[in-house]
Amino acid sequence: MIRTMLQGKLHRVKVTQADLHYEGSCAIDQDFLEAAGILEYEAIDIYNVDNGQRFSTYAIAAERGSRIISVNGAAARCACVGDKLIICSYVQMSDADARLHHPKVAYFEGENQLQRKAKAVPVQVA
């Protein structure tokens, strides 16, 4: 059996730019891509915390250290500057590998300051 697992996650990054006329994609600070193990041109899913929109695109690199999160092309209609996003990439693997797998999660606050990195999503409690 093949399972699709969370590979990398940027949690609560803030949109710094939305460019409807750029050819597509989501530009992400290279430091952020590395923190979550997301490659340039990799498929990503984006979840907009502010408006509930969920959409797919691909990652491109933005200048390292710029803290840029730019939603481009048609996807720019799904996010506004200042919106908080969760950006995820996924990987397919065998059931056996999935049971040993740990995603790369990067948590952000404020103006896209990386707060911490983790290899799991915390257990939700009541």
UniProtKB/Swiss-Prot annotation:
Molecular-function GO terms, alphabetical: aspartate 1-decarboxylase activity
Sites where the protein binds substrate: 57, 73-75
Main location (coarse class): cytoplasm
Cofactor(s) named in the record: pyruvate
Pyruvic acid (Ser) modified-residue sites: 25
CC cofactor note: Binds 1 pyruvoyl group covalently per subunit.
Pathway involvement of the protein, from the record: Cofactor biosynthesis; (R)-pantothenate biosynthesis; beta-alanine from L-aspartate: step 1/1
SUPFAM superfamilies for the chain: ADC-like
Sections of the chain in a coiled coil: none
Subcellular location: Cytoplasm
Active site: 25, 58
Presence of the UniProt keyword Lyase in the record: yes
Highest rank taxon of the organism: Bacteria
PANTHER family hit by this protein: ASPARTATE 1-DECARBOXYLASE
Subunit and partners: Heterooctamer of four alpha and four beta subunits.
Function of the protein: Catalyzes the pyruvoyl-dependent decarboxylation of aspartate to produce beta-alanine.
Protein name (Swiss-Prot/TrEMBL): Aspartate 1-decarboxylase
Organism whose genome encodes this protein: Yersinia enterocolitica serotype O:8 / biotype 1B (strain NCTC 13174 / 8081)
